[in-house]
Amino acid sequence: MSVLLIPATQRTPELAFDPDAGHLRIAGESFPEDVNAFFDGPMGRVNEWLDESQGPVLLDFQMIYLNSSSAKVFVKLLVRLDAQAALGRDCRVRWWHDAEDFNIRELGEEFRDRVDHLRFELCEVVAGDTHS
């Protein structure tokens, strides 16, 4: 399976998926006009990879803003990863948030509270730091 890179737009996040590394990054703003049209293809590839692979998974969220439709897509992904983690797979989520962005931090806390087995880290971005 090849690397997937969908650049961010004004309404959609960047999606970067490297199946060999087991790394998915979702970054930016997410309020697409048609959430299914935007996410179905990429999430289908991720789900296919989850079915075919047993390797570790790292999911980095670097969100600036997301609407409720995008949040539902993310919850479905987190539930799927949580089920994989319950079976013993190494699954980890890093939810990056700016130190001043309490709304995004709070949303990350809500997502974290929905999973039982998944390692879910809230990661504060410090000015000048870079991460991937």
Residue ranges of predicted features:
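Short, well-structured hydrophobic secondary-structure segments
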Residues: 31-56, 67
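Surface-exposed, flexible loop/turn segments at secondary-structure boundaries
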Residues: 32, 101, 128
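Secondary-structure boundary motif
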Residues: 48-52, 83-87, 113, 117
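Amphipathic alpha-helical interaction surfaces in cytosolic regulatory modules
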Residues: 42, 58-112
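A cross-taxonomic marker for long C-terminal extensions/tails that follow the last structured domain
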Residues: 2, 6, 105, 109-132
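STAS-typified acidic loop motif
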Residues: 3-40
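Structural motif
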Residues: 23, 56-58
